[in-house]
Amino acid sequence: MTERLKVVFQEKIAPKLIEKNRYKNKHQVPVIEKIVINRGLGNASQNTKILESSLNELTLIAGQRGVLTRSKKAIAAFKLREKTPVGVAVTLRGDRMYAFLDRLINLALPRIRDFQGINPKSFDGLGNYSLGLEEQLMFPEIDYDKIDQIRGMDISIITTAKKDSEGFQILKEFGMPFKE
């Protein structure tokens, strides 16, 4: 079964972008390539329970098991050894990516307290968008009673767009609630 946003993209958004930007064919239309959810855990090297619970939360949110990110080199000031776990990350592609984007736009972001929209200036110059969330409670999959600590996460939406304006257009068409 194909995801709702994937069908919306193929049937409504892509033709609209072809007409608006005067692309010669449908393959020139920028698409969302992947979504990367990352959570850095500074104190995870001392406590494996934090690491495990964070990995389970990201698995619930993304619908796919994450991987541990490890330190590349030792830093004595942070009591950090080389190759110790420092975070977790999940890369979503295909149907799972569209399912997560749908839940993010329609369920999670509206549940943020005092939500006014997300910052339209968080593009990287190549059409990719990054967004930081301060807590995981906005996702309906997370049970408030089962979390041990409120932790945030970084979400990067990587597109095939060449410019920020193209990336903005595609995310706006998907319904991303940008600030005016």
Swiss-Prot record:
One of its GO terms (biological process) is translation. Coiled coil: none annotated. Pfam families: Ribosomal_L5, Ribosomal_L5_C. GO terms for molecular function: rRNA binding; structural constituent of ribosome. It is found in: Plastid, Chloroplast. Disulfide bonds: none annotated. PROSITE patterns: RIBOSOMAL_L5 (PS00358). GO terms for cellular component: chloroplast; ribonucleoprotein complex; ribosome. The keyword rRNA-binding applies. Keywords: Chloroplast, Plastid, Ribonucleoprotein, Ribosomal protein, RNA-binding, rRNA-binding. Belongs to the universal ribosomal protein uL5 family. Binds 5S rRNA, forms part of the central protuberance of the 50S subunit. Part of the 50S ribosomal subunit; contacts the 5S rRNA. This is Large ribosomal subunit protein uL5c. It comes from Tupiella akineta. The gene is rpl5.
